[in-house]
């Protein structure tokens, strides 16, 4: 009758498992130290760039330009302190500076987008390594933050910095546009006031030679208001009733013409303000839309990354299960042969 060797078999299996677990623990400890050292260096070097410094420089330039605009605004709107040539030169310089700052902002925005996408691809290519490290850390009851979460936090922070710069650029640009509009309004008013008076009728039948010689435009300069009133009364007394009617008609036509010009100027100013408001609204709307699109793209990248990571983990689990099944089968066969050998020897 065959003896019961099950207790001996269980002892052998326990000894083999203990030795294997001890060796795996030593190997995992050494490998974990090496990977922690390499990954800590990689995480530290991940954000070593001059993005924040460049953003700080751009913000400093915008603040300085805003100060310059505020300081020069009073002289800019005064014709006695600045000439038209100086104002045009200031407009050109300020416009060029704003364009350069906007290009710098676009460069920083594109750089951050490319850096974030490159970091996501790097995590995607090394996802198995990070998952192994995090699983070991969690087994040791240590709170660990995934490097991808750190990257997402840094990316959100930098997006906030870019939004702040965008608001500053819009504010400085709107300030510059406002003083340009005020200058345009003042110039239109001056042009309206300096419009030459229409000449009186040249018909010889309406005015005599004596009346033309003593007209107000050709009269001698007066020194006091009383002299001016006296001169005006003398001039009116020498004109005929028909001439007075003609002057009154021309005066009414001139007033109507000036009123029409004033209405046109007001309409133009209102149109300019409406255009500027629409431009600002469109700019804000486009900014919000671009931010929403960026968030959607980021969410899509995260979803794709999680799906690929899940597929890799699933394939890894399948391979591990297959290896475990094979090892179990081979172990059972070996143990069976070993038991038969012991039984044969016994």
Curated annotation (Swiss-Prot):
The record's listing under Pfam families reads:
Syntaxin-18_N
PROSITE patterns attached to this UniProt entry: T_SNARE
Lumenal side residue ranges read 343-346
Q: Where is the signal peptide?
A: none
Q: Which GO terms describe its molecular function?
A: SNAP receptor activity
Keyword terms of this UniProt record: Coiled coil, Endoplasmic reticulum, ER-Golgi transport, Membrane, Protein transport, Transmembrane, Transmembrane helix, Transport
An annotated GO cellular component: endoplasmic reticulum
Q: Give the matching CDD domains.
A: SNARE_syntaxin18 (cd15850)
Q: Which domain of life is it from?
A: Eukaryota
UniProt similarity note: Belongs to the syntaxin family.
Identify this protein by name.
Syntaxin UFE1
Taxonomy of origin reads: Eukaryota, Fungi, Dikarya, Ascomycota, Saccharomycotina
Query: Gene for this protein?
Result: UFE1
């Amino acid at each position: 009758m065959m003896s019961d060797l099950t207790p001996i078999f269980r002892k052998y299996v326990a000894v083999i498992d203990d030795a294997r677990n001890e060796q795996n623990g030593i190997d995992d400890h050494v490998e974990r130290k090496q990977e922690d050292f390499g990954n800590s260096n990689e995480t530290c070097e991940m954000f070593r760039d001059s993005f924040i410094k460049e953003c700080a420089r751009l913000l400093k330039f915008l603040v300085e330009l805003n100060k310059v605009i505020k300081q020069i605004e009073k002289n800019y709107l005064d014709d006695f302190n600045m000439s038209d040539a100086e104002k045009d030169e200031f407009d050109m310089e300020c416009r060029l500076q704003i364009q350069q700052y906007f290009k710098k902002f676009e460069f920083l925005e594109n750089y951050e987008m490319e850096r974030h996408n490159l970091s996501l691809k790097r995590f995607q290519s090394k996802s198995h390594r990070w998952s192994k490290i995090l699983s070991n850390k969690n087994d040791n009851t240590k709170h660990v933050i995934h490097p991808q979460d750190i990257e997402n936090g840094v990316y959100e922070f930098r997006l906030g910095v870019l939004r702040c710069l965008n608001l500053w650029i819009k504010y400085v640009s709107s300030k510059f546009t406002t003083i340009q509009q005020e200058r345009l309004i003042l110039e239109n008013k001056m042009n309206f006031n300096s419009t030459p008076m229409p000449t009186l009728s040249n018909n010889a039948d309406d005015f005599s030679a004596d009346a033309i010689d003593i007209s107000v435009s050709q009269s001698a300069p007066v020194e006091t208001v009383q002299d001016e009133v006296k001169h005006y009364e003398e001039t009116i007394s020498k004109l005929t009733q028909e001439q007075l009617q003609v002057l009154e008609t021309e005066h009414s036509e001139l007033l109507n013409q000036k009123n029409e010009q004033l209405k046109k100027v007001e309409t133009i100013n209102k149109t300019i303000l409406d255009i500027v408001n629409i431009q600002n609204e469109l700019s804000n709307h486009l900014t919000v839309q671009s931010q929403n699109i960026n968030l959607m793209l980021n969410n899509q990248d995260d979803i794709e990354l999680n799906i690929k990571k899940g597929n890799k983990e699933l394939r890894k689990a399948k391979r591990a299960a297959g290896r475990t099944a094979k090892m179990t089968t081979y172990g059972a066969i070996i143990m069976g042969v070993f038991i038969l050998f012991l039984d044969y020897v016994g």
